[in-house]
Every structure is written in C-alpha cells, then in structure tokens.
C-alpha cells in the first residue's frame, strides 16, 4: 500500500530529531513522509513549572487533536510523555527503537551524583528525579528548570545550578558532547518508557500494520508494556515520583520499580519477573502498594496545586 504520510511532531530540536528517525524508517518502507510541527501546551507555556499545569497530556494533547482531526496521519511522541490511557480513537501502532533510558547528570565538572559538592544545586522539573536524588543526597538543593535540552544546559552554565539532570537518550539523539555522568539505576531509576518513541495513529487506519512493521521494536515494546502497566496500576502519570526499568530477554521480562516521597525520605522498591509484560507490571504495582507506595502517592496527589 505505502503512499504519503503526514507525521506530526513538536518543534523542539529533540522532537524533530526523533521524528526524522521515524520518518527515515517509514521512507525505507516505501512511504513518502512530510513532517508537520505542532505546538503543544508545554511549548505554549515554556516557563511554567509542570506542577502548575493541570494536564496529564501536556506534551501530547495538540498532537492527538491533530491526529483525530485528520490533519496528520501519525504522531511521534517521547514514550515517557504519553499518558497510560490514550484518547479514544487513537492507538499506539509502534514502539520505535529504544535508546539508553538512563538519566544523565550534566555539569561543567562532569560529576556523578555522589561527587557533587555539599549543598549543590541540581536542576530538574521532574518530581521523580527530585525525589530519588534527595533520597540519595538529602543535602542537595533541587531547583526547577524548564526548556528544551539546549536551553536547560545554557541556564545551568549561566549559573542557575551546578548541574542539570537530562535523559541520556536526548543527549545522544542530538549529538551533544557535554560533560556528563550516566546515573546508575540503583541511584535513579528512569521514567516509564524513557528512551523509547511512541508512534500514534488513528484506530482503523488501513496503513497501521505497514507502519508497525516499519518501526516497531518488539523488545522495546515488551519493556514499555511492563513499565506502563506498572504506572497504570499505580494510577500514576508523568508527574508522580515513580521510576521503572524493564529488561526483555528471551521470553521473559524483568521489571524494577520505585515509588519515592517528594522529600526523598521514604522509598518503596521491588522487582518482578515473568513472561507476560503487563501481568509483571500489575504484580509489581500490587507489591509496591502493599509496601507503602499507596501512602506516598496519596500524599503527592493531595498536595498538588
């Protein structure tokens, strides 16, 4: 079938790099692809902390609306930004290749988390990162930061902080050579779906299977399925302090997860292994809730603006 596709994407350099990677795969499968930039809520409110934007789909809503309206044929998102429940009429056709999901600590000194000076300021807009960093280093001062990858690094270098936490996948995809340390997962577990790309299409699109064959990574799909099942069972979103990392191998999936209080004082963690990714995610969620995660998540929801 092939044919022409209009691919919707945010306009940031990272979003465009991710969209171009998917477009290349589609072109190799015989599609003609046009990229169309769409501004999302996050782009329109670049200086507002995510905690005050009362919207789970802050990075995806306008792309979803364009998809449902027929303005674009598919949309590419960072999987970590996609709510666990996608809008009616939209399906995730593919999980495109997953880069290293780890977080990176960017600083002029190239410090790791344990090497940061006492009381150092670390910039991040993520509650997940804040909570896990404070669990490891209660002395750190975590400061809010917004903007695309280049903007955050520039703000850090201008004196906003001694270091900034970014997804390592973003640095790699942008080809940025900056001093940084990859943060081990026993210090900072990634966001659900971090490093993977989500390809969304309209339900019933006759090209869905062709798009899937061109872009889907089965191992990444299994990993993401386990992580998103965990988050869904915890009734969380991108603004709750949940970290997860699934590793697919053979027929099984190993999933690790943590829920951490915003001040870092309390942490519930565990792991599960099994053959069915979503069942693994649900089992781990049940275990974490029994261990105290329910109280942490209830507190977080209660104190949000």
Curated annotation (Swiss-Prot):
InterPro entries: HemC, Porphobilin_deaminase_cofac_BS, Porphobilin_deaminase_N, Porphobilinogen_deaminase_C, Porphobilinogen_deaminase_C_sf. It comes from the Bacteria. Keywords: Porphyrin biosynthesis, Transferase. Its EC number is 2.5.1.61. The modification S-(dipyrrolylmethanemethyl)cysteine is found at residue 238. Transmembrane segments: none annotated. It catalyses: 4 porphobilinogen + H2O = hydroxymethylbilane + 4 NH4(+). Binds 1 dipyrromethane group covalently. GO terms for molecular function: hydroxymethylbilane synthase activity. Pathway: Porphyrin-containing compound metabolism; protoporphyrin-IX biosynthesis; coproporphyrinogen-III from 5-aminolevulinate: step 2/4. GO terms for biological process: protoporphyrinogen IX biosynthetic process. One of its GO terms (cellular component) is cytoplasm. It is an enzyme of class 2 (transferase). Its cofactor is dipyrromethane. Monomer. Tetrapolymerization of the monopyrrole PBG into the hydroxymethylbilane pre-uroporphyrinogen in several discrete steps. The porphobilinogen subunits are added to the dipyrromethane group. Belongs to the HMBS family. PANTHER family: PORPHOBILINOGEN DEAMINASE. This is Porphobilinogen deaminase. It comes from Rubrobacter xylanophilus (strain DSM 9941 / JCM 11954 / NBRC 16129 / PRD-1). The lineage of its organism: Bacteria, Bacillati, Actinomycetota, Rubrobacteria, Rubrobacterales. The gene is hemC.
């Amino acid at each position: 079938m092939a044919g022409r596709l209009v691919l919707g994407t945010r306009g940031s350099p990272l979003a465009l790099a991710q969209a171009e990677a998917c477009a290349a795969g589609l072109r190799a499968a015989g599609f003609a692809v046009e990229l169309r930039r769409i501004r999302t809520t996050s782009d329109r409110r670049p200086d507002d902390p995510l905690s005050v934007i009362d919207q789970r789909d802050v990075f995806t809503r306008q792309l979803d609306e364009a998809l449902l309206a027929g303005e674009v044929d598919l949309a590419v998102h960072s999987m970590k930004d996609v709510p666990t429940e996608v809008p009616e009429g939209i399906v995730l056709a593919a999980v495109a290749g997953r880069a290293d999901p780890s977080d990176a600590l960017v600083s002029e000194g190239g410090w790791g988390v344990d090497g940061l000076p006492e009381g150092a300021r670390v910039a991040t807009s993520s509650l997940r990162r804040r909570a896990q960093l404070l669990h490891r280093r209660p002395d750190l001062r975590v400061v809010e930061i917004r903007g695309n990858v280049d903007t955050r690094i520039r703000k850090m270098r201008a004196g906003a902080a001694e270091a900034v936490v970014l997804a390592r996948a973003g640095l790699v995809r942008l080809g940025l050579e900056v001093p940084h340390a990859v943060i081990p997962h026993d210090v900072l577990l990634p966001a659900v779906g971090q490093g993977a790309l989500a390809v969304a299409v309209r339900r019933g699109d006759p090209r869905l299977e062709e798009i899937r064959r061109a872009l889907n990574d089965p191992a990444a799909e299994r990993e993401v399925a386990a992580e998103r099942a965990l988050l869904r069972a915890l009734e969380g979103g991108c603004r709750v302090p949940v970290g997860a990392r699934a590793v697919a191998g053979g027929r099984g999936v190993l999933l690790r997860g943590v829920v951490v209080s915003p001040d870092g004082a309390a942490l519930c963690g565990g792991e599960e292994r099994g053959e069915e990714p979503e069942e693994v995610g649900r089992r781990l969620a049940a275990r974490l809730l029994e261990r105290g995660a329910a109280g942490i998540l209830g507190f977080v929801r209660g104190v949000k603006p």
